[in-house]
Amino acid sequence: MSGELNGNDTSAQAAVSAGSVLEGAAFADEGEQHNESMKTLVLGALGVVYGDIGTSPIYAFREALHAAATNGILARSDILGVVSLIFWALTLVVTVKYVLFVLRADNNGEGGILSLMALVRGALKGRPDLILGVGICGAALFFGDAVITPAISVLSAMEGLEIVAPNLTPFVVPATVVILVTLFSVQKLGTGRVAIVFGPIMALWFVALGASGLWHIFDDPTVMAALNPYYAVRFLTVSPAVAFVTVGAVFLAMTGAEALYADLGHFGRKPIVRAWLWIVFPCLLLNYFGQAAFILSHGEAAALPFFQMIPSFALWPMVLLATAATVIASQAVITGAYSVARQAVQLNILSRLEIQHTSEKLHGQIYIPRVNLLLGLAVVILVLGFEKSSNLAAAYGIAVTGNMLVTTVLLYIVMTRIWNWRVSRALPIILGFLVIDMLFFSANIIKVHEGGWASIGIATVLVLIMWTWVRGTRHLFQKTRKAEVPLDLIVEQMAKRPPTIVPGTAVFLTGDPKSAPTALMHSLKHYKVLHENNVILTVVTASKPWVASADRARVSQYNERFMLVTLTFGYMQQPNIPRALGLCRRLGWKFDIMTTSFFLSRRSLKASVHSGMPLWQDKLFILLARTASDATEYFQIPTGRVVEIGTQVNI
């Protein structure tokens, strides 16, 4: 009944909405229609993929300068060193690592940490639990990032009020909370109608970034000398202790880079790469170098350089545009959180969650109430607790650097096991990435006491929850399997002592088709009847994102009364059992929903001292199982056709 652990349902449901567009644009390289599709996808990528990294200039350069200052004093070499570090970090991590390598490690067109985990688990058969653990850690860190991004992004934009109208400073936090509460409150309405403007707004944002930066580069054109890596190396070597702390702040310029890979299934590789190389990367560099030039010529203006370099007549529009951009960035992260949560459910590393579709036309538009509530509460608590974006900066880096580190480790396995690269070719590249990732991770991990504990705490709790669910479902499967009777034996006994036969079809959901389903055993025990046709149904999640309808169902006739059916879904597909069973007509079984009853087992779990898990983990697993979404709704079975049979199990 549940998807197998070596299957996958990762990726983003938000990706589904763009999937059909992607297919038409990803293969042809000529023709006017393709060009228009590519432009549309590039514009869409600006609104979804680059919202997070695109709003980093608001606070990243400021935080790096604060870290680099000695006794509050910044030398020219410090400013050039910081902007040089940002340039080379964006070049090496985003342009080289993600654009040239990670984006090529797709799982049938899909990306994201869980999709990468699925790809690697399929190639590395020997240690599935190790890869599963790495994937769980990556997913947990993603959720840690998803909590911090809306908080720091919107808060940093609202801090522009301190420049526009200093008397409004006390309202920065309340205004941020109001915006975030509103954002999370409207999620259930869907974002389809407003999402169409995300791309144009972010395009305007990047133009504003580039234009404001280019204007101020002329304040001190010598700032362009920082393109030379000499300034970055000199900054790192002259004062290593200060530089080490600064590196942690420099990383803020790259937060959101993982979205390039996570949203691969939304738009495809080409639009994401082109948006980065043509628009995002140039505009980010212009803005960072513009901020550096502005500070070099206005030494006293290092407090909020992003807003301070904006002309007074444009301040209010820029604050409003920044707020819109950060809300869009937050929306992209929220959508991504829904997607990863759904993937985790399909991979059976999270309990079933209620998933609501907010669009009849676009299946990728989903809303998960529980994720929305918990995420919204966590974001608001962070804003109220930290109050300033500077205080949140320390918490931000740990989650993202950890996620990038996990990606690098899995990328090595992809290179050697899937791309069949020689170790001598893959290892130098991966070691280079690991050195950079470890430098950033270690520079951020020392900030645990400054706020890093928040992201570590969130990730740790989520790892415990996911691992408890994985471990608990395994123990439950082993426990129930011991008590189950082989299906062969039951069929043989019924052949000798046939029960009363009643008309209709009974479908019994089970995770093990070789054993008699619990619901079947209880039906025979209490009702003493057997339907004319009995289907032993198993639902499996494949290790690829999509499974074609032609490959959805496998049917084998057991005997005249019993049939074995296996339904396979991709990890990007929402299981719909009645619709999938309808496909069995071409295989010789005429499925009729009006004459079919679905028998499900509802287990009542009790903690046991002999479960093999600590008592606290038993209780946590039982809580997760009790609060899981109803199987009837999850598999989209009509409630009027369902018979639930309860059993009690000591785990």
Swiss-Prot record:
This is Probable potassium transport system protein Kup. Its main location: membrane. It comes from Brucella melitensis biotype 2 (strain ATCC 23457). GO terms for molecular function: potassium ion transmembrane transporter activity; symporter activity. Keywords: Cell inner membrane, Cell membrane, Ion transport, Membrane, Potassium, Potassium transport, Symport, Transmembrane, Transmembrane helix, Transport. Belongs to the HAK/KUP transporter (TC 2.A.72) family. It is found in: Cell inner membrane. Disulfide bonds: none annotated. Transport of potassium into the cell. Likely operates as a K(+):H(+) symporter. It is a multi-pass membrane protein. InterPro entries: K+_transporter, K_trans_C, K_trans_N, Kup. Coiled coil: none annotated. The chain crosses the membrane at residues 41-61, 82-102, 130-150, 163-183, 194-214, 235-255, 276-296, 309-329, 366-386, 395-415, 426-446, 450-470. It comes from the Bacteria. One of its GO terms (cellular component) is plasma membrane. It catalyses: K(+)(in) + H(+)(in) = K(+)(out) + H(+)(out). HAMAP family: Kup (MF_01522).
